[in-house]
């Protein structure tokens, strides 16, 4: 890794989720490269930063996972405001929401105001599981089958790296082609947008489903940060207040901005 030789990128806010430290599928080297190269005024950790579920099944904690946490905590000491909104895989941290862990702020949820005065609800997203009807296939995918898929994903990408090809998400490819999975994603997005609408906010930022997205749903801005297992993505608010998705490519760890969606700037909520 050559993070020190690459230019530093300055942004206003960065939102990342679903890193899953403690899991073998975590792309910790890319998370670390991202954190070292991107200088942000505010860093939002939108849940599932540490995968306690995976650690309980089989303890796995290499040095690079420590390095990620140290880098995050280091940012709190050098001018970055870090706001942590725990998810379902690190739900133990929800017991101390509303407190400070050093300079790290821990919240059950948070309302972020962009430079363009858009008010965005920030929450992990597992809160919507009860409102979404999951099929049997998705229930299995969320446990054993999903673990198998990610294992296959790791092998496929090891081969692709040897052949000089960039990272490709097998799990994401399969989910995008299964009707029930897409129905679940649609229901999740609608439930998330409704949560922001009920509070008269302009939009919502969440994670949980490992599917990065920026779109407008009936006047509500829906943003999903994605993950660092499959997508290796982050939601970025640039210094002008514009939101976009970034994907961190392991082919030289090159930064790739996702195409900007056709979403108009939303008016500030009354």
Q: Which residues fall in each region the model found?
A:
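Core catalytic region of metal-dependent phosphoesterases/phosphodiesterases
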Residues: 4-12, 23-115
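Short glycine-/acidic-enriched loop or helix-start segments at secondary-structure transitions
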Residues: 54-56, 93-96, 132-133, 214-216, ...
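Residue-level marker for buried hydrophobic side chains located in beta-strands
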Residues: 13-15, 43-45, 121, 205
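Conserved beta-sheet core of the metallophosphoesterase superfamily
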Residues: 103-109, 121, 126, 130-140, ...
């Amino acid at each position: 890794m050559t993070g020190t030789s690459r230019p530093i990128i300055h942004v206003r806010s960065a939102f990342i989720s679903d890193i899953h430290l403690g899991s073998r599928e975590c792309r910790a080297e890319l998370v670390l490269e991202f954190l070292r190269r991107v200088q942000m005024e505010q860093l939002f950790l939108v849940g599932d930063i540490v995968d306690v579920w995976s650690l309980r099944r089989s303890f796995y904690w290499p040095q690079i996972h420590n390095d990620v946490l140290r880098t995050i905590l280091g940012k709190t000491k050098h001018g970055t405001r870090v706001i942590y909104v725990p998810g379902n895989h690190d739900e133990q941290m929800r017991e101390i929401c509303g407190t400070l862990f050093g300079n790290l702020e821990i919240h059950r949820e948070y309302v972020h105001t962009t430079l363009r005065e858009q008010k965005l609800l920030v929450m992990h997203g597992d809160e919507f599981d009860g409102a979404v009807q999951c099929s049997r296939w998705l229930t299995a995918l969320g446990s054993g089958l999903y673990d198998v898929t990610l294992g296959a994903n790791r092998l496929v990408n090891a081969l692709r790296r040897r052949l000089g090809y960039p990272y490709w998400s097998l799990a994401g490819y399969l989910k995008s082609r299964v009707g029930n999975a897409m129905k679940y994603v649609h229901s999740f997005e609608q439930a998330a947008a409704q949560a922001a609408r009920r509070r008269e906010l302009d939009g919502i930022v969440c994670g949980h489903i490992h599917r990065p997205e920026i779109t407008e749903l009936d006047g509500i801005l829906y943003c999903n940060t994605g993950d660092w297992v499959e997508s290796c993505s982050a939601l970025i608010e640039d210094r002008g207040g514009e939101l976009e998705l970034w994907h961190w490519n392991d082919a030289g760890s090159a930064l790739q901005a996702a195409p900007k969606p056709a979403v108009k700037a939303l008016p500030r909520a009354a």
